UniProtKB/Swiss-Prot annotation:
Belongs to the NUP186/NUP192/NUP205 family. This is Nuclear pore complex protein NUP205. It comes from the Eukaryota. It is found in: Nucleus envelope; Nucleus, Nuclear pore complex. It comes from Arabidopsis thaliana. Its main location: nucleus. One of its GO terms (cellular component) is nuclear envelope. InterPro entries: Nup186/Nup192/Nup205. The keyword Transcription does not apply. Keywords: mRNA transport, Nuclear pore complex, Nucleus, Protein transport, Translocation, Transport. One of its GO terms (biological process) is systemic acquired resistance, salicylic acid mediated signaling pathway. Part of the nuclear pore complex (NPC). The NPC has an eight-fold symmetrical structure comprising a central transport channel and two rings, the cytoplasmic and nuclear rings, to which eight filaments are attached. The cytoplasmic filaments have loose ends, while the nuclear filaments are joined in a distal ring, forming a nuclear basket. NPCs are highly dynamic in configuration and composition, and can be devided in 3 subcomplexes, the NUP62 subcomplex, the NUP107-160 subcomplex and the NUP93 subcomplex, containing approximately 30 different nucleoporin proteins.
C-alpha cells in the first residue's frame, strides 16, 4: 500500500502541475489510487486499542511487519501508550508512529512531551495527506482544469466506486464524530492540547481537527457534484447542519462557520442539481421519492428555538422551495399524479411564506455571503457556492409563483413606505425591510460571479418586472443596486445603459439623475445669492437615490464597450457642481467623486479637464489662508471642517475617502512631475478604507516623486535654520519632503503607521479571517510596509544634509526593538505574499550595515526561534504553490534564498547562520548541523533539493538552493559543518541529480527560455558542489572518503578499488598501450554526457540593434542611451540581476526612449503627425522586444558558460586529486581530452567556452603525461616485473592521431584570439612532449636491455618494435601537422612576430616543436621561405640598440629572447650540418655577437632571490640567456670539425674566434670561476665555454687574451686528485668528467695538430717559458683517478643490476634500506605495500645504473684521450735523447721517464683488468691501446 505522503505527492504532481501528466505519471497515479482504495474507502478509520497489543508493548519488545524486533525502554512505552489513549490508536500503531517520528525528526535528546507532540503532529500530517488526496481527486473531476478527458473519466470512475462503497457516508460520519470532545475527535479534557506540525510550529490540536473537518466538508460538497446523494444522506447532512449551526452562537469561529457553510451548500447543491436533472430527463435521486418529500417537508418546516440555526434552516427552505417548484412543473405535466401536484403546491406556498416572513434573504446576506468566513474560504469552493447560488436565484426568479410572491412583497412595501423624496428619521422604526428582500441578495450573489450573467434571459426578464412603478426610495435604491451588479460585465453594462436611456421605466433613467443634480444646484445657487437665506435641506431619499444612480453610472462607464462608452456621457461637469456645497451629504459627495475617478481611469485624456473642474468646484482649503490674503467671497471646500465636524459626528467618512481616492487616481496618471494624518466609526470597514486611501496617497508620493538636488539647496546643517524651516508655511514644502521629515523624526505619520503594524501579525491574521474588513486591513498593512521600504530607499539621500534633527529610518526603528520584531514577523503572514515580500526586504535592508547586531538582538529578546520557523514556513509554503511567479524579484522563495546567500560571508553571527540553525552559542565552525532535529530553512532546502517538487515552477529555488550549499561549503566558518552534513549517506542524493538534473534533456529555448537558463545554472552549481566535495573531502573521514568515491563512480562510471588506506587502480597496461581511440564497449560516462549538454550554439547577445531601428533616424539616439553601461549612475537603464548578469531594465529603457523622443517635441504626445507618432511607437515596441530578447540571450550565454565552468572544475579536480582511485584512468582522461578538443573545435563553441575547454584539455594531457610514469603494478601480486618498470601507459597511435587532429582543428577555428591560442600552443607542446617516449624516462636503454636479457618473458618484449612504433607515431604527427601546415604556420608566425611578449614566447616554442618533428626539412624550408629565421636573428640583433640591463627589466622580453635562441639551437641540432650552415649563412654569429643581453659584468654566481627579488630575477634570467647563447655557439662549432682546412683558419673559425674576442670578459670570468662551488647553470656555462675554446682557439696564433693559460690552469686544478673527494660528495662527478674530457680534447688537439710537447714533470719545465703547461705526470695522475672512477662505477653498476634482478627476493627491510640509500623516502608512505616499495626501489636503482653507465662511457673516452697523448710522447724519441738542452741532463730525464712509466704501469694493468660485463662496453680497442702504452713505457725504461 502506498503511504499517504507518497500518495499525496503522486496526486499533486500529476494533477496540479503546470503541464499535463505524462503517460508514466498517469500509470503511477492510477496504480497509487487503486492500491490506496481501502484507505480512501475507510477514510481515517484506524484499528482501535487492544489489550493484547497493549500487553505486547508493555513487554518492551515488539515486532513490526517487515522489520527486526524493536526494543522499547520505559519512556518509549509511556509515550506509545499515551499516544494510544489520546488518539484512540492501536498500541502497535503507536509504536510504529514513534518509529516514524524518529526517522522524520530525530528524537534523541528530546523530552517526552516534545516527542509526543511531534508524533501527534506526524499522525495528523498523515491524515491530512489522505484528506488532501481525496480533495484533489474530487476537485480534478468537478473543475475543468485542462486535464485529458479520459484521465478525468478514469478518476471519476474510481471516485464513484468509492462513493458507492460508502465514502460519502464516511465523510458525514467523520464531520460529526470529529466534533466530539473525546480522543477520536477534538480530544478529551485530559488530552494534550498541542502538537508540533510538519513545520515545527506548536499548534492547537483543536484547530488541526477543525481544519480536518473543513476539508472533509469540502470533500462532501465536491462528492455531491460527482454523484448525487440519496434521501438518507440528505437527512443526515440536514441534522448535522442543524447541530453545527446551533454551535455557531457560542463563538465567532471562522472555520466552524465554513464547516457549516459546506453543509448548507451541500444541501443547496443537492436540491438544485437533483431538480434540474429531473427536468433534463436525467437520473434523479430524491425528486422521485414522494415519501421523502413529505417527510422532509415536515422536517424542514419544524421551527427551532435557536435563531441562528433557524436562519440556516431558512436557507434550506429556500433551496427546498426551488426544488419543489422545479419538480412541480414536471409533475403537473403528468395527469396521473394530480394529487401529488396539489400537495407540493401547498408545500411550496408554506415554504415561501416562511421565507419571506423571516427574511431569509437578509439572513443569508448578513450571516453567510457577507461574512469574512465565506469570503476567506477556498476560492474553488466559493466559486462552486456562487455558481449554485446563481442557479438557485435563476430558478427562483424564473418561476411564476416566486415572481408573484416578490411582487406581493414589493407592493406591500410601497404601500407602507413614504415616497422616496421624503425622509423622516422618526419613522425609521416603522419602516420594515419588506422593500428589498430578494434584491440585495440577488445583487450580491450576481456580483460574486459576474461572468454567470452572460445570456441569462431569466434575470433580465426579472429586471424589467422589478423596475416598474417604484414610489419610494428604498425599493428604488434596491433596484438600482441590482442594476449596478448587472453592469459588472461588458454585456451587462451595455444593457443597463440602454435600459436607463430608453423608456422602459417611467420614472427611472439617466435624465432623472441629471435633472435632480441640476435642480439642487439651482436651489443652492439661489440660496447663496439671497442674503441671510438658509441653505435648503438635501432630502435623504434624493441623496440615496442619487448615490445609487451614480454607482450604476460608474459601473457602466468602467465596464462598457470601449468604443461605445466614449459617447455615452460627453458632459461630466454636472458631477462637480454639488461638491462645493457644505450641506451635501458626505456619502453623496463620495459617490460623485468615485464617479469622477472612474472617468479618470477610463478616459485619461479627460485628466486635464477634470483637474480644471476640481480647481473650480472641489479643491479643499487644508490649512488656514496665508497672511495678507483676504477671505474669499466664493464657496470653498474646507476638508478639515467636513472631516472633523460633519463626518466624525456621523462616524462615517465617505467624502474624505472618495476625495483621497480621486486625488490618487489623478496623481497615478501624471507623467510630468517636475512642477510639483482616534475616531469613532459606525462601520469599521470605512475606518480602514480611510486608512488605505491615505496610505495609498503617501505611497504614490514617495514612489512617483524624486528628490532633486535643488530641493535640498535650501537646507543647511545649522539647527536653527532647520527649525525656522519647520515654522515656515507648509505650502512651500514639497509633499515628499514633509513625509520623509516625519518618518526621519518619528512623528505623527510614522507613529500612526507603526501603530498599524505593531498590532502584530497574529492579530492581523485573526482579524483577516474573522472580520469583514479583514481584506482592507490587510491592504493597510501591505501599504505600510511598502511605504517603509520607500523611505528606506530615500532616507540616506537626505540624512547627511538633515542631521542631527532627522535620522535614517533604521535609527528611528532601533529606538524600540519591538518595532523591528513587528516588521520582521510579517514574514509569517501567508495570506498575502506582498506582505511577506516586504518583510523579507526589510530584513535584507536591516541585516546590512544599517543595523549592526541584529542577530544578537533577536536572540536577546527571544524572537530568533519563531523567526527561524517563520522563514522556513514561508519558504515551504512557496514550494507548495502551483503557479509561476513572473518576476523573480517578487518571488518569496528567491528573496529568502538570496538573503541566505548574501549573508554567508557577513561577520558571525549572521542572518544566514541564524536561519539555517547554526549553533550561535559557540563558534559557528564547530556546529553539528541537525536539520532533522530542527525545523529551519536548511531542512526545507534539503528536502526540496532531494525531492525537486514542481520543477517547472520551482526551478529558480533549486538553482539558488544548490548555490547556497556551494557558498556554505566555500565559507571558512560554515564549510566544515556543511561538508560533514552532506557527506552523510542521507544527503548523497545529490549524486542522483547527475541523472535527474545533470544529464537530463535541456528544455527547449522556444518552450521556456527562463527554465532553460535556470536548468543550466542548476547543473553548474550541482557540479561545483560536487567539485568542492572532491576538493575538500578529508581523507581522515571515512564518510568524506566514501562520498568522494561515490562521486567519482557516478561521474565517470567506474568502480573504485582500494588497497590499504590508499586507493589504487587495479588494472595493468599491455605493451601496446590502451586502444580506445576506436570502437569501445564502454558506455559514455556522465562527464561526457554533461559536456554534450553544453554543446549548442550560444544565442546572439550582441548589441546589434534590430533592422527597423538601424534603418530609421533613431539609431544614434538609441546607441547613446545604450552606450552608458555604468549601473551606478542615476537613471541607468542597466541593472544587475540576482545572478550578477548586467541586463537592460526594460521599464527604464522605455521611459528613457520616450523622454529622449519627447525632448524634440516638448508637449506630451505632440508629435508632428499621426504617422510620426505611429512610427515612434512601433520603433519603441521593436526596441523593447529586442531588449527582452537581448536579456534572455545574455542570461542563457552566461548560464552556458557557468555550467561549463562547473563542469571544468569537477573534471579538473577529479583529474588532479582523485582520479588515481579509478580503473582505466588514462582512458577516462583521454576521453575527456578528446571530447574537450572536439567541443572547442566545433563552430558552435564560443570563444570563452573554447578557452575553458582548452584549459581542461591542458589538465588532462598534463595528467596523462604524469600518469605514464606512475606505479602500475598489479595489486594481486607482490612481485615486480620489468614490464612494470619499463613500460609506460601510453595512448594508442590512433588515439594520439585523434587528439592531434582535433587540436589542429581547434587551433584553426574561425573565431580565435591570442590568449586562446597561447593555451592551445601550450596544449600542443604538452602533446609533443607526451609522444616523445614510450619507455619510461627513468629507465636507460642499457638497463632495458639488461632487463630483457634477464626477464623470463623477455621474448614478448621487443625494443625495436617499440622504437618502430614511436617512429611511426612521430612520422604520423608530422604528416597531420603538414596537412594543415600553412594555416598553422600563418597563425604561429604571426603570433611570434606581432603578438604580445607572452604570445611571442610560446609561439617560438611551438616552432621549435615543429622543427623537432620535421622529417623532410619541410618546416626549415618554410621558415626560410617566409624569412622568419632571418627575422628572428634580426630581433636578437636589435637588442643591441638598447641597453641590455634595461632589457632585462622587461622580464617577458627576456623570455622571448630565450625562446628565439632555443629555436635556433633546435634548428642546429635537428638538421645537423645543414641546419648549422643555414644559420651561419644568415650571419647567426654576427647577430648573436651584437646582442647586448649577454654583455654581463659582475658575478656569474646565483643571486640571493630572497634579498632582491627583481634584481635577482633579472640576473638569473641573464645567466639563462648567456647559457642559451653559449649552447648555440657551441652547436655552430660543430661546423669546425667538418670543415676542410689546413693550418689556416676558415670563415667559421674566424667568426667564432671573433665572438670569443668580443666577449672576452665573459670567457675570462668563466675560466676563472671556482667550479668546486658552481651551481648547475654555472657549471654548464663553464663546460660550454671550455668546449668552444677547445674547438677553435687552437687555430688562434695570438694568445694575447690569456685563454690558453686559463685552460692550462684549469687542467692543473682538475687533473689532480686532491679536490676530487669533496667534489664527488656534491654529486657533480659527471659534470667534472665532461669538463675534463673537453680539456683533454683541447690538449689532444694541441699535441696532434700543433705538435705541442709536454714535460714529464714540473721540475723539467724551463723557467723562461711563459705558459705553465700540464705535465705527463699530471696526465698519469688523471689516468689513475679515471681508473678509480671506472672501477667504482662499474662495481656499483654491477651490484645494482644484481639487486634489480633479485628485487623480488629481497625482504621489506632490505627494500627500505635501498630506498633510504637512494634518498627516495618521500615517495613512500608507511601504508604502502611491499609491491609498491619494490617498484620504487627498482625504478630508483635503474636510474642510478643509467647515470653510472653514462659516466662509464665518458670516463672511457677520457682515458682514451689521456692514453693517446702519453703514447704520442712515448713514441717521440726526444723524450729519451739529449739533443735538446731544454730537457735537462740525460740522467735526470731518464729518471723522470722511469718515474712516469712506473706510475703508468699499475694504472694500465688495472685498466686491462676491467670486466666488460661490469662495464657494459666492448673494451678490445681500449685495452689494446692501453697495452701499447704499457709496452712503450717499458721500452723507454729499459
Amino acid at each position: 500500500m502506498v503511504s499517504p505522503k507518497d500518495l499525496v505527492a503522486i496526486v499533486h504532481s500529476s494533477l496540479l502541475g503546470t503541464s499535463r501528466p505524462t503517460p508514466t505519471q498517469r500509470i503511477e497515479l492510477t496504480h497509487a489510487i487503486r492500491n490506496s482504495f481501502p484507505s480512501l474507502q475507510n477514510l481515517l478509520s484506524f484499528p482501535p486499542p487492544k489489550p493484547s497489543d497493549r500487553a505486547q508493548v508493555q513487554s518492551k519488545e515488539i515486532r513490526l511487519p517487515d522489520s527486526l524486533p524493536i526494543s522499547l525502554d520505559d519512556q518509549d512505552i509511556a509515550i506509545s501508550l499515551k499516544l494510544s489513549d489520546e488518539l484512540h490508536l492501536n498500541e502497535i500503531d503507536s509504536v510504529r508512529l514513534l518509529v516514524s517520528s524518529n526517522q522524520e525528526w530525530g528524537l534523541m535528546g528530546r523530552d517526552p512531551l516534545e516527542i509526543q507532540r511531534l508524533a501527534t503532529g506526524l499522525w495528523y500530517t498523515g491524515r491530512r495527506d489522505l484528506t488532501s488526496t481525496l480533495y484533489t481527486l474530487l476537485r480534478a473531476v468537478v473543475l475543468d482544469e485542462g486535464l485529458e478527458p479520459d484521465l478525468i473519466a478514469d478518476i471519476q470512475g474510481l471516485l464513484e466506486e468509492l462513493i458507492e462503497a460508502g465514502l460519502r457516508q464516511r465523510l458525514i460520519t467523520l464531520i460529526k464524530e470529529l466534533n466530539r470532545e473525546d480522543p477520536t475527535g477534538l480530544g478529551g479534557p485530559l488530552c494534550e492540547r498541542y502538537l508540533i506540525d510538519s513545520r515545527g510550529a506548536l499548534v492547537e490540536r483543536r484547530a488541526v481537527v477543525q481544519r480536518e473537518r473543513l476539508i472533509l466538508g469540502h470533500c462532501l460538497v465536491l462528492s455531491i457534484l460527482v454523484d448525487r446523494p440519496g434521501s438518507k444522506d440528505v437527512k443526515d447532512i440536514y441534522y448535522i447542519l442543524k447541530d453545527n449551526a446551533a454551535q455557531l452562537t457560542e463563538g465567532n469561529d471562522t472555520i466552524s462557520s465554513q464547516i457549516t457553510f459546506s453543509l448548507l451548500f451541500s444541501l443547496i447543491i443537492t436540491f438544485v442539481s437533483d431538480a434540474i436533472s429531473r427536468l433534463s430527463d436525467k437520473s434523479s435521486m430524491i425528486s422521485q421519492d414522494a415519501s421523502f418529500r413529505t417527510d422532509f417537508q415536515d422536517i424542514v418546516m419544524a421551527s427551532g428555538s435557536d435563531p441562528t440555526a433557524d436562519g440556516f434552516i431558512g436557507g434550506i427552505r429556500l433551496a427546498w422551495a426551488v426544488h419543489l417548484m422545479l419538480i412541480h412543473d414536471g409533475i403537473s405535466g403528468m395527469d396521473t399524479i394530480s394529487t401529488a401536484s396539489t400537495t407540493d403546491m401547498g408545500h411550496i406556498c408554506s415554504c415561501l411564506e416562511s421565507i419571506f416572513s423571516k427574511n431569509v434573504f437578509q439572513f443569508l446576506l448578513d450571516n453567510v455571503l457577507r461574512t469574512a468566513a465565506y469570503q476567506n474560504d477556498e476560492e474553488d469552493i466559493i466559486y462552486i457556492y456562487n455558481a449554485y447560488l446563481h442557479k438557485l436565484a435563476s430558478c427562483f426568479l424564473s418561476h411564476p409563483i416566486a415572481r408573484d410572491k416578490v411582487k406581493e412583497s414589493k407592493d406591500m412595501a410601497m404601500s407602507v413606505l413614504n415616497s422616496y423624496r421624503t425622509s423622516d428619521p422618526l419613522d425609521g422604526s416603522m419602516q420594515t425591510e419588506e422593500s428589498d428582500r430578494p434584491l440585495p441578495f440577488i445583487s450580491l450573489m450576481e456580483f460574486k460571479e459576474p461572468e454567470l450573467l452572460s445570456g441569462n434571459d431569466v434575470l433580465w426578464t426579472f429586471v424589467n418586472f422589478a423596475g416598474e412603478d417604484h414610489t419610494n426610495f428604498k425599493t428604488l435604491v434596491a433596484f438600482l443596486e441590482m442594476l449596478c451588479t448587472l453592469a459588472s460585465t461588458q454585456e451587462g453594462a451595455s444593457k443597463v445603459y440602454e435600459l436607463l436611456r430608453g423608456t422602459s421605466f417611467r420614472s427611472i433613467g439617466w435624465p432623472t439623475l441629471f435633472d435632480c443634480i441640476r435642480i439642487y444646484d439651482e436651489k443652492f445657487k439661489q440660496s447663496l445669492q439671497t442674503a441671510g437665506a438658509m441653505m435648503p435641506e438635501f432630502l435623504e431619499g434624493d441623496a440615496k437615490a442619487l448615490v445609487a444612480y451614480l454607482n450604476v453610472l460608474q459601473k457602466v462607464v468602467e465596464n462598457g464597450n470601449p468604443t461605445e462608452r466614449k459617447n455615452w456621457f460627453p458632459d461630466i461637469e454636472p458631477f462637480f457642481k454639488l461638491l462645493g456645497y457644505e450641506n451635501i451629504p458626505p456619502y453623496l459627495k463620495g459617490a460623485l467623486r468615485k464617479t469622477i475617478a472612474a472617468f479618470v481611469n477610463v478616459f485619461p485624456e479627460m485628466r486635464d479637464s477634470i483637474w480644471a473642474f476640481l480647481e473650480q468646484y472641489d479643491l479643499p482649503v487644508v490649512v488656514g489662508s496665508q497672511v495678507g490674503k483676504s477671505d474669499q467671497s466664493s464657496q470653498v471646500y474646507d476638508m478639515q471642517f467636513e472631516l472633523n465636524e460633519v463626518e466624525a459626528r456621523r462616524e462615517q467618512y465617505p467624502s474624505t475617502i472618495s476625495f483621497l481616492n480621486l486625488i490618487n487616481a489623478l496623481i497615478a496618471g501624471e507623467k510630468d512631475v517636475n512642477d510639483r494624518g482616534r475616531r469613532a466609526y459606525s462601520d469599521p470597514c470605512e475606518k480602514w478604507q480611510l486608512v488605505v486611501a491615505c496610505l495609498q496617497h503617501f505611497h504614490m508620493i514617495l514612489s512617483m516623486y524624486d528628490i532633486q538636488e535643488e530641493d535640498l539647496d535650501g537646507f543647511t546643517e545649522h539647527p536653527h535654520f532647520l527649525v525656522s524651516l519647520e515654522t515656515s508655511s507648509l505650502q512651500t514644502q514639497l509633499p515628499i519632503i514633509e513625509l520623509l521629515k516625519d518618518f526621519m523624526s518619528g512623528k505623527a505619520l510614522y507613529r500612526n503607521l507603526m501603530g498599524i503594524l505593531q498590532v502584530g501579525v497574529n492579530s492581523i491574521i485573526s482579524e483577516r479571517l474573522s472580520k469583514t474588513y479583514g481584506k482592507i486591513l490587510e491592504k493597510a498593512v501591505q501599504l505600510s510596509l511598502e511605504i517603509l521600504l520607500l523611505v528606506f530607499e530615500k532616507d540616506l539621500l537626505v540624512s547627511d544634509v538633515w542631521r542631527p534633527l532627522y535620522q535614517p529610518l533604521d535609527i528611528i526603528l532601533s529606538q524600540d526593538h519591538n518595532q523591528i520584531i513587528a516588521l520582521l514577523e510579517y514574514v509569517r503572514y501567508d495570506s498575502l505574499p506582498q506582505i511577506q515580500r516586504s518583510s523579507i526586504k526589510i530584513m535584507n535592508i536591516l541585516r546590512c550595515s544599517r543595523l549592526v547586531g541584529l542577530v544578537p538582538m533577536l536572540i536577546k529578546i527571544d524572537a530568533a526561534n519563531s523567526l527561524i520557523e517563520d522563514y522556513a514556513a514561508c519558504l515551504e509554503g512557496r514550494l507548495e504553490e502551483g503557479e509561476v511567479v513572473e518576476n523573480s524579484c517578487d518571488d518569496l522563495g528567491v528573496l529568502i534564498m538570496q538573503l541566505l546567500v548574501d549573508n554567508i560571508n557577513r561577520p558571525a553571527p549572521s542572518i544566514t547562520h541564524l536561519l539555517l540553525k547554526f549553533d550561535l552559542d559557540a563558534p559557528v565552525e564547530g556546529t553539528v548541523l541537525q536539520p532533522k532535529f530542527h525545523y529551519s530553512c536548511l531542512k526545507v532546502i534539503l528536502e526540496m533539493l532531494e525531492k525537486l517538487p514542481n520543477p517547472d515552477i520551482n526551478f529558480l529555488l533549486f538553482e539558488f538552493g544548490f548555490q547556497l550549499l556551494c557558498e556554505l561549503n566555500l565559507d571558512p566558518l560554515t564549510s566544515g559543518p556543511t561538508m560533514d552534513l552532506l557527506s552523510s549517506k542521507k544527503y548523497q542524493f545529490f549524486l542522483q541529480h547527475l541523472d535527474t538534473i545533470g544529464v537530463a534533456t535541456l528544455p527547449k529555448r522556444s518552450g521556456s527560455q527562463a527554465l532553460r537558463i535556470s536548468s543550466l545554472h542548476q547543473r553548474a552549481w550541482l557540479l561545483k558542489l560536487l567539485a568542492i566535495a572532491l576538493h575538500t573531502g578529508s581523507g581522515s573521514s571515512s564518510a568524506h572518503l566514501e562520498a568522494c568515491q561515490s562521486i567519482l563512480s557516478h561521474l565517470f562510471g567506474r568502480e573504485v578499488t582500494e588497497a590499504a588506506n590508499e586507493p589504487f587502480s587495479s588494472s595493468t597496461y599491455p605493451q601496446d598501450g590502451l586502444d580506445y581511440a576506436g570502437t569501445s564497449s564502454i558506455s559514455k560516462s556522465k562527464a561526457l554526457a554533461l559536456l554534450e549538454i553544453l554543446q549548442f550554439r550560444s544565442p546572439d547577445a550582441s548589441m546589434q540593434l534590430p533592422q527597423i531601428v538601424s534603418s530609421l533616424k533613431y539609431d544614434s539616439l538609441v546607441e547613446d542611451i545604450l552606450g552608458n553601461r555604468d549601473t551606478s549612475v542615476s537613471g541607468s537603464i542597466y541593472y544587475y540581476s540576482e545572478r550578477g548578469d548586467r541586463l537592460i531594465d526594460l521599464s527604464s529603457f522605455s521611459n528613457k526612449l520616450w523622454q529622449k523622443l519627447h525632448s524634440g517635441f516638448p508637449l506630451v504626445d505632440s508629435f508632428p503627425n499621426v504617422a510620426e507618432l505611429s512610427e515612434v511607437r512601433e520603433t519603441i515596441q521593436q526596441l523593447l522586444k529586442w531588449g527582452w530578447k537581448y536579456n534572455r540571450n545574455l542570461e542563457e550565454q552566461a548560464a552556458q558558460l557557468h555550467m561549463l565552468a562547473g563542469w571544468s572544475q569537477i573534471v579538473e579536480v577529479s583529474a588532479c586529486r582523485r582520479i588515481s582511485s579509478l580503473d582505466n584512468r588514462s582512458e577516462i582522461l583521454y576521453r575527456i581530452l578528446d571530447a574537450s578538443l572536439s567541443a572547442s573545435a566545433s563552430p558552435d563553441c564560443s570563444l570563452k567556452m573554447a578557452f575553458v575547454l582548452t584549459q581542461v584539455a591542458l589538465t588532462c594531457i598534463a595528467k596523462l603525461r604524469d600518469d605514464r610514469f606512475s606505479f602500475q603494478g598489479a595489486l594481486s601480486s607482490d612481485t615486480v616485473t620489468c614490464l612494470d618498470v619499463m613500460m609506460v601507459k601510453h595512448l594508442s597511435t590512433g588515439a594520439c592521431h585523434s587528439v592531434l587532429f582535433k587540436l589542429v582543428m581547434a587551433i584553426l577555428r574561425h573565431e580565435s584570439s591570442e590568449s586562446l591560442r597561447r593555451r592551445q600552443y601550450a596544449l600542443l607542446l604538452s602533446y609533443f612532449q607526451y609522444c616523445q617516449h614510450m619507455i619510461a624516462l627513468d629507465v636507460p636503454t642499457s638497463v632495458v636491455q639488461f632487463l630483457l636479457l634477464n626477464e623470463q618473458d623477455g621474448e614478448d618484449l621487443d625494443i625495436q618494435k617499440i622504437d618502430k612504433e614511436q617512429a611511426d607515431l612521430a612520422r604520423a604527427n608530422f604528416f597531420i601537422i603538414k596537412k594543415e601546415a600553412q594555416g598553422i604556420l600563418d597563425l604561429v608566425i604571426k603570433d611570434a612576430s606581432q603578438g604580445s611578449e607572452f604570445g611571442k614566447t610560446i609561439s617560438l616554442y611551438v616552432l621549435e616543436a615543429l622543427v623537432c618533428i620535421d622529417h623532410e626539412r619541410y618546416f626549415l624550408s618554410q621558415l626560410q621561405s617566409r624569412g622568419f629565421i632571418r627575422s628572428c636573428l634580426g630581433s636578437i640583433s636589435n637588442i643591441s640598440y638598447q641597453d641590455g640591463t634595461h632589457l632585462l627589466e622587461s622580464q617577458q622580453r627576456a623570455c622571448t629572447l630565450e625562446a628565439e635562441l632555443a629555436l635556433l639551437l633546435r634548428i642546429s641540432h635537428k638538421y645537423g650540418k645543414s641546419g648549422g650552415q643555414v644559420l651561419f649563412s644568415m650571419g647567426a654569429l654576427e647577430h648573436i655577437a651584437s646582442c647586448r643581453a649577454i654583455s654581463f659584468k659582475g658575478n656569474m654566481r646565483r643571486v640571493d632571490m630572497k634579498l632582491q627579488s627583481d634584481v635577482g630575477y633579472n640576473v638569473q634570467k641573464q645567466r639563462t640567456i648567456i647559457t642559451a647563447v653559449l649552447r648555440l655557439v657551441f652547436a655552430l662549432t660543430s661546423l669546425v670539425e667538418t670543415s676542410e682546412f689546413f693550418e689556416g683558419r676558415n670563415k667559421i673559425v674566424r667568426d667564432v674566434v671573433e665572438f670569443i674576442k668580443g666577449h672576452q670578459s665573459l670567457f675570462d670570468q668563466l675560466l676563472r670561476e671556482d667550479f668546486t662551488q658552481a651551481d648547475d647553470l654555472l657549471m654548464e656555462q663553464i663546460i660550454l665555454a671550455v668546449g668552444i675554446l677547445s674547438k677553435v682557439w687552437p687555430f688562434e696564433e695570438n694568445d694575447g687574451y690569456g685563454f690558453v693559460q686559463g685552460l692550462f690552469d684549469m687542467m692543473s686544478k682538475l687533473f689532480i686528485a686532491s679536490p676530487i673527494k669533496s667534489i664527488l660528495s656534491q654529486g657533480s662527478e659527471l659534470k667534472l668528467s665532461q669538463l675534463r674530457f673537453s680539456l683533454t680534447s683541447y690538449l689532444y688537439f694541441l699535441v696532434t695538430k700543433n705538435s705541442l710537447r709536454l714535460q714529464v714533470s714540473d721540475d723539467s719545465l724551463d723557467s723562461s717559458t711563459k705558459l705553465r703547461q700540464p705535465t705527463l705526470l699530471l696526465l698519469a695522475s688523471l689516468l689513475s683517478h679515471v681508473t678509480d672512477s671506472l672501477e667504482r662505477a662499474a662495481e656499483k653498476k654491477s651490484l645494482l643490476l644484481h639487486k634489480i634482478r633479485d628485487i623480488n627476493e629481497l625482504s621489506r627491510q632490505d627494500v627500505d634500506a635501498i630506498i633510504k640509500i637512494c634518498d627516495s623516502q618521500e615517495y613512500v608512505t608507511p601504508s604502502d605495500n611491499i609491491h609498491k616499495r619494490r617498484y620504487i626501489a627498482m625504478v630508483e636503482m635503474c636510474q642510478i645504473v643509467g647515470n653510472r653507465d653514462q659516466l662509464i662511457t665518458l670516463l672511457l673516452q677520457l682515458a682514451e684521450h689521456v692514453l693517446n697523448i702519453i703514447l704520442i710522447h712515448l713514441q717521440d724519441r726526444s723524450v729519451s735523447s739529449n739533443e735538446r738542452g731544454s730537457y735537462g741532463s740525460k740522467s735526470h730525464i731518464q729518471q723522470e721517464v722511469t718515474d712516469l712509466c712506473g706510475k703508468l704501469s699499475p694504472t694500465i694493468d688495472r685498466l686491462a683488468l676491467l670486466n666488460e660485463g661490469k662495464v657494459g662496453h666492448n673494451l678490445k680497442v681500449f685495452q689494446r691501446l692501453a697495452t701499447t702504452v704499457k709496452e712503450m713505457a717499458i721500452q723507454k725504461c729499459v
